[in-house]
């Protein structure tokens, strides 16, 4: 569900207010996905806003609106290739600003290594993911962390072996050829993740 802020009355033609999502039976919403962050950063840049924390503040408003409507939040964080040297600062800001004043008991963190997502890119390795997951747990007081950087059949068992990873965010099941989400492949990924 999209958790547009700005109230719950009026025309929201291309947005879905949090209360509308809750009324439809949604229990969770995804906030801060790298694509959403890029969109917001692009709009802010067009408006001349250069404050890098602005996106995190906007997402914080969405988190609070979602929680006020009774939704739980899957909050995405991640660093781009040019941010890897400062990953602790980038991810720390996304967490501290984005979750400021939020009920953390109703939040799960999805980690997206943005620099490694997509066809032809080198996936993040186990030591890197372990380091990030440990950092996120330390920064958030132990919130659940799921991996959102391409959980697929060929890395499901490896990701399941990481003690600080509590699950995965699966948007696609096939990353080459006919890219898409295929239910039978989704079930196979789950089977492999669970070790069955």
Name each model feature, range by range.
Residues 37-121:
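Conserved anion-binding
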Residues 45-48, 52, 174-196:
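C-terminal helical cap(s) of enzyme catalytic domains, especially alpha/beta-barrels
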Residues 7-14, 113-144, 151, 179-181, ...:
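Glycine/Thr-rich beta-alpha phosphate-binding loop at enzyme active sites
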Residues 2-57:
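Glycine/small-residue-rich loop that forms an oxyanion/phosphate-binding "nest" at active or ligand-binding sites
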Residues 30-39, 79, 103-106, 113, ...:
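Glycine-rich phosphate-binding active-site loops on the catalytic face of alpha/beta enzymes
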Residues 1-6, 34, 78-82, 114-116, ...:
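Active-site beta-loop-alpha junctions enriched in small/polar residues
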Residues 1-2, 29-31, 73-75, 107-111, ...:
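Hydrophobic faces of well-ordered beta-strands that scaffold small-molecule active sites
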Residues 150-165:
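Catalytic cores of alpha/beta
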């Amino acid at each position: 569900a999209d958790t547009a802020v700005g109230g719950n009355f009026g025309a929201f033609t291309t947005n879905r207010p949090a209360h509308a999502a809750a009324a439809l039976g949604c229990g969770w919403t995804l906030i801060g996905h790298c694509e959403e962050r890029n969109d917001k950063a692009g709009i802010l840049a067009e408006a001349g806003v250069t404050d890098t924390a602005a996106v995190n503040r906007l997402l914080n408003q969405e988190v609070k609106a979602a929680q006020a409507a009774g939704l739980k939040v899957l909050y995405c964080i991640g660093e781009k290739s040019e941010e890897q040297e400062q990953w602790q600062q980038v991810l720390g800001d996304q967490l501290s600003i984005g979750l400021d004043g939020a009920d953390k008991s109703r939040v799960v963190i999805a980690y997206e290594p943005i620099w490694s997502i997509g066809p032809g890119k080198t996936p993040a390795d186990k030591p890197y993911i372990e380091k990030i997951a440990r950092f996120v747990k330390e920064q958030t007081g132990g919130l659940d962390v799921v991996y959102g950087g391409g959980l697929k059949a060929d890395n499901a068992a490896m990701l399941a072996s990481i003690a600080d990873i509590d699950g995965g965010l699966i948007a696609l099941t096939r990353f080459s050829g006919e890219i898409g989400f295929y239910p039978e492949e989704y079930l196979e990924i789950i089977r492999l993740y669970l070790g069955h």
